[in-house]
Amino acid sequence: MGLLLLLSLLSACFQPRYAPTWDSLDQRPLPSWYDEAKFGIFMHWGVFSVPSFGSEWFWWDWKGAHDQNFIKDFMKRNYPPGFRYADFAPMFTAEWYNPLQWAEVLQASGAKYVVLTSKHHEGFTNWPSKYSWNWNSVDNGPHRDLVGELAMAIRNNSDLHFGLYYSLFEWFHPLYLKDKQNKWTTQDYTKDVGLAELYELVNAYHPEVVWSDGDWEAPYTYWNSTNFLAWLYNDSPVKDTVVTNDRWGSGMLCHHGGYYTCSDRYNPGVLQKHKWENCMTIDKKSWGFRREATLADYLDMDDLVKILAETVSCGGNLLMNIGPTHDGRIVPIFEERLRSMGKWLQVNGDAIYATKPWRAQNDTRESGVWYTSKNDSVYAIVLDWPNSGQLTLGVPRSSPTTTVTMLGWAAPLKWVAVSGSGITVQMPTASSNQLPCQWAWVIRMKGVM
């Protein structure tokens, strides 16, 4: 026992400590779980879920610089004169919010991590923050700790890593507006609200993803980002497992932080040198729930599997967003997409989880084919079934030990080498309901170069 304690102490002594500089912070290795996970679920939920119209930027579009007339017209048609955005908060009731049910749906999606909005740009906190009096989910609205309840449900009933989105700025916070007017020479908002809430969140809920946003107006020095990250990596309760993104100040995107997001819906289509994430949303027009959305506004399963394949092939993670309702429901169309992704991953997860990019990301001869690799296997994710029943791949080079199979299909597949480079694979002869999945099919090749 004494020896184990000594070894533990010695290990702690030799853990690197990171200085509050980008040169130092950028040297921190990304915890391995994140790259292995590949797929996560984003959830945008807040007071904006009450009007659930336009997007989660409803308040800004109504009262901010955008001043969109369609929002004004919506308010005139549906709410009395003098109605304020703050009046939506008591309507954020979450009476149907069942964290155990959410955890089950999220687990069924095949995702390996979830990122919940703790606070969006409106400033309403989904936990009882002592720095957001009467503008939080315990003092107002649901009168529940929405963050804490989901954190517990996820950890006790799933194998997902729990993460939190946090907006550094608030559109209309007087301290923030004063600092902005002072051209960031004062930091009253950062000290009294932004940093205080971040430390509170990490210490209370131990998120393994800290997904920062709302940083773009001010430099990282205003946000004290490097000091916070040094604490997060050195001394926080999640210092060994936490991952962060690149939204820590103006000009930081795609340059500094943990993994890169670069922009919303970032999907470069080519291999990147740095670990990255494609954060995108099933509703093509909004991150929050919209009551006016039509079926055509939602990405279908062909779209989603394609985006997953493209993203993972090029070394990224996919963070796919849904928007719960004001009363705490995951509506059927979102649930259907999540469960369908899970069914696809049950069959084809070997081509996604813990994979590495191969020497080629997509095929040179057959469009709609994306590659991943793991150990001695190369996976070709085939988005479109070939009309002829034969699939010719231009990149793989066969060898005497080459074998070809389809994930979820018991029998090996027949194949022949193509002169020069490539192989032609005979796809299974079967009806659509006999195939292992509906949307995309994975060819596993061993012994190819």
Swiss-Prot record:
An annotated GO BP: fucose metabolic process
EC annotation from Swiss-Prot or TrEMBL: 3.2.1.51
Principal subcellular localization: secreted
Any one of the GO CC terms: lysosome
Keyword 4Fe-4S appears in the UniProt entry: no
Glycosylated sites: 156, 224, 362, 375
UniProt entry tagged with the keyword Secreted: yes
InterPro entries for the chain: FUC_metazoa-typ (IPR016286), Fucosidase_C (IPR031919), Glyco_hydro_29 (IPR000933), Glyco_hydro_29_CS (IPR018526), Glyco_hydro_b (IPR013780), Glycoside_hydrolase_SF (IPR017853)
Record's catalysed reaction(s): an alpha-L-fucoside + H2O = L-fucose + an alcohol
Record GO terms (molecular function): alpha-L-fucosidase activity
Keywords: Glycoprotein, Glycosidase, Hydrolase, Secreted, Signal
Subcellular location: Secreted
Leader sequence residues: 1-19
Function: Alpha-L-fucosidase is responsible for hydrolyzing the alpha-1,6-linked fucose joined to the reducing-end N-acetylglucosamine of the carbohydrate moieties of glycoproteins.
Family: Belongs to the glycosyl hydrolase 29 family.
Assembly with partners or alone: Homotetramer.
Protein name per Swiss-Prot or TrEMBL: Alpha-L-fucosidase
Originating species: Branchiostoma floridae
Lineage: Eukaryota, Metazoa, Chordata, Cephalochordata, Leptocardii
